[in-house]
Amino acid sequence: GEHPDVSTAVTTTGWPLLDSSRGKAIFVLLGGGDLRADYHSKFPNLESATMFTMSVENTPESAIFSNTNPIGDAEEIQALVEAGYIVRSRADDAGGGEADNNETERRDKAIEIGAHSISTDYPTQVDGIEYWLDLNVRCNPISAPPDCSNDAIE
């Protein structure tokens, strides 16, 4: 492309708009450490790569980040979203008892700070637990243009 690296492209030009993205998929290598380093060595700046990698720090390959702590790291996540990166976060922690207690603070914060992808262990109702995640497609509260309409993106 016209940018020296992926990070510069997403933070200056941005991602393709929804109309030009419909029917397409994004692939992301979730593995980190040596696996990510090996992939980056084969595809410097992700040039000709089939998939993005999950970023942990700002590098030339950065495009998609994962931070599962929307409460404690809210400012960091929101700053990444504002910069143009895609951010994945979590709505709940199955091991932490949040769902058992119908605690929604983590979920609500992930939505509020603009996480694009919000993972859950409760995509449908579970017997004996009130909590479950039912998110509709919506305009991002941080990165969507002012004229964005939820109806237009469904």
Where are these regions (language model features)?
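Catalytic cores of phosphodiester-bond hydrolases, prominently lipid phosphodiesterases
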Residues: 1-154
